[in-house]
Amino acid sequence: MESEEMLAGGLTEPRPATPEIQEIANKVKPQLEEKTKKTYEKFEAIIYRSQVVAGTNYYIKVHVGGNSYVHIIVFQNLPQLNEPLKLIGYQVDKTKDDELTGF
């Protein structure tokens, strides 16, 4: 990820999702489907925010078809630990206009 000026622990401003963010979302899609008991045919990352902690939290708005969106939080540990991405939170029944906030 590009370097950005922000306070540790603070959320960045929302920005358009990149191919890297789509890849992160795709990797945790099975975790979300297991937790929500739903299958998402469409799973397109739209915008994201990030938060530097002991690793990085990615807050991602995902379009799942029609007028439906979900907000997910994905934790990526420090690279040297080589651990898998983990879905640590989600909100369903979101709309295109719902603000992507910390939750």
Swiss-Prot record:
Q: By its UniProt entry, which Pfam families does this protein fall under? A: Cystatin
Chief place where the protein resides: cytoplasm
Q: Where is this site: Reactive site?
A: G10
As for what it does, the entry says:
This is an intracellular thiol proteinase inhibitor.
Q: Which PANTHER family match?
A: CYSTATIN FAMILY MEMBER (PTHR11414), CYSTATIN-A (PTHR11414:SF20)
**What is stated as this protein's family in its record?**
Belongs to the cystatin family.
Listed name of the protein: Cystatin-A8
Q: Which organism is it from?
A: Sus scrofa
